[in-house]
Structures are given as structure tokens and as C-alpha cells.
């Protein structure tokens, strides 16, 4: 009986997500379907749009610990919920 109880406790601990991990989209296309699980300490999802030439944008998405600072010809959006950087 003690073995069964100990086994249940171990399985419960292994299966529970004891900490919240943020999930952000991570791909260079306009319409993104790939995502990544952020590392410990990364609590921000971001989307960076970099204008390469008129009417041509490069998309960069991912996780960050703080919201990145934009450079000229860049737009940056930051958020803090799962897959919010669409």
C-alpha cells in the first residue's frame, strides 16, 4: 500500500507543471504556425517588423525577458500571454 501511495505521489509531481511557462510564436513569416516554449525568466512575447524596402517587411517573433528596443524602420509589439505575438 505504501509503495502504491509513493508511486502516485511521484507520478503526480512529475506530471504537474509546477511553474508557468510562456509559449510564443516563433517564425519569420507573416502567418505563423510554429511556436516555442520560453526559457525560465522570459516573460514577454514580441513581434518585430523590420522594413527592408518599401512594402517589404521581415517578421521576427519570439520570447524575451524584456521588450526589445526598436531601431529605425522597425516596429515592435510586446505582450505577455500565450501565442499573443501574432
UniProtKB/Swiss-Prot annotation:
Q: One Pfam family this chain carries?
A: Toxin_cobra-type
- First and last residue of the signal peptide: 1-21
Q: What is the effect of changing residue 58 to A?
A: Weak increase in inhibition potency toward both muscle (Torpedo) and neuronal (alpha-7/CHRNA7) nAChR
Q: Give expression by tissue.
A: Expressed by the venom gland.
PROSITE patterns in the record: SNAKE_TOXIN
Coiled-coil features, chain-numbered ranges: none
- Record's comment on post-translational modification: The disulfide bond Cys-27-Cys-32 is probably not needed for efficient interaction of the toxin with the target receptor (Torpedo muscle or alpha-7/CHRNA7 nAChR).
| Record InterPro entries | Snake_3FTx, Snake_toxin-like_sf, Snake_toxin_con_site, Toxin_cobra-type
Instruction: Cite the position(s) of the site with description Important for interaction with human M1/CHRM1 and M3/CHRM3 mAChR, and only weakly for muscle (Torpedo) nAChR.
Output: 58
Q: Among the entry's GO cellular component annotations, what is one? A: extracellular region
- Record family assignment: Belongs to the three-finger toxin family. Ancestral subfamily. Orphan group II sub-subfamily.
Per UniProt, subunit arrangement is: Monomer in solution.
The entry's protein name is: Tryptophan-containing weak neurotoxin
Q: Which organism is it from?
A: Naja kaouthia (Monocled cobra)
